[in-house]
Amino acid sequence: MTTNETTSSLDALTSLSKRRGFIFQSSEIYGGINGFWDYGPLGVELKRNIKQAWWDDMVRNREDVVGLDCSIIMNPRVWEASGHVGGFSDPMLTCRQCRRHFRADHMDDLIAQSDWIASLAEAGDADEQGMLTLERGKLERWIRKRGRKQAKGMALVKDAETHLDAVARTIGEAPRALRDVLVVLGMPGLPEDSDPMPCPFCGGDLTAPRQFNLMFKTHIGAMEDHSAAAYLRPETAQGIFCNYRNVLDSYRIRPPFGIAQVGKSFRNEINPRNYTFRSREFEQMEIEFFCHPDEADTWYTYWRDLRYNWYVKLGLESSKLHLRDHDPDELAHYARACADVEYDFPFGTSELEGIANRTDYDLTKHQEHSGKDMRYFDDQTRERFIPFVIEPSGGVDRAALAFLTEAYREDEAPNDKGEMQKRTVMKLHPRLAPTKAAIFPLVKKHGMPEAATAIYEACKKAGVTTFYDEKGAIGRRYRRQDEAGTPYCITVDGDTVSDGTVTVRDRDTLAQERIPADDVPAFIAKSLQCE
């Protein structure tokens, strides 16, 4: 997929999400706030359905996983023990010209998405190995036509007369990789204590990387001093570790067992981007599964495969879903093994969920800092040990974005006159669809609204999330529900009044069938159960 196609695809999804009430920018009437998003009527139902599907499949329908709901603000010593206070940071770069901040380890992605870098590469000549040659004349034309608009912060662009000859000679010596070309372009006037790469947004010079702690800090009580400092949790996992002994002592359960939690977390991301994918406020679905150290590798493989298949069962195309094991040099300091479930988003392949073997790191750290014994005594084997932990950790917001991306389709369907027209349809898995069925009276007379209302009430009573709509041509009503991802549309017409049957239209196949009106709730419920 090209950069333009990627942007177009994400723009189309973003537009539909706002138009149909899936996702809104937070505080939009005041210009919004970067890294925060609100979920509209359809979006909140989609998220609720994702969380419910996860809870049913990972907790309620299992005997070895129990739930927990921990406080967002915890004793700050928790984060000292876990290492977050001293080590939960990212390398940050700051552009001295445009004042943008971004993570140093995101530079490759930002280069790939940069407009001025793309136009620069197009101005040169690349060989089969991707090595770029940029002659003086072409560089000068790029500065004049594109650089002055797209890379205003670059010293070379601002003062080409002074720097062009030296830069052109260096670049012209031999073909270079794009990153090497960018470093040469950014060298003129570069201050000390700078990163060699120019800013991917404006071409300006960047500060050297410095560590930036990602935790949101707040204060408890009336005084804002060091003794009152606290943090919004950056992950839900530590609350589970702190309550491990409480669950073990109060609930009749023993290793191997898991503790699950769904909840909000907060990270002061340097550069939130890619729509809802990387936000400062987000929701997590996490399990900490406690097991004997000798069984950890087996349980790790089990949870890794289970979590991958869960996404496939809920509609993500396996060709776009990848299970990637981390190389040894990628592993976090606490992990023996880790795998990412990755998805092909419009902006690139990125992590949807991580599954890690965290060993006994967390429980050991909390035992050291709290003085509480985190060992488990097995009265059958007479062994005392600190359990190893397998952690499947997924994001609700990332899952929602993946399911929306996968569901978005453009195809053709007949209009009211039978003519084929382009339609946009969200082919969400029925378990996740915000609305399961829409009820339409064909016209607002002849007893049809009354009959449709009766079906609507019966569906609601049966627990089927239903939408009632009697406004507009039937074709336009179908289109609205297609964009909302509603699997079934039920139309009440003249035959309904005479013979008690209705038309059921399938969102994906467009097939229609007639069934008794009284059977609609059971038909919808059965169809959803079969998925």
Task: Name each region found by the language model.
Residues 1-531:
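NTP/phosphate- and nucleic-acid-binding module
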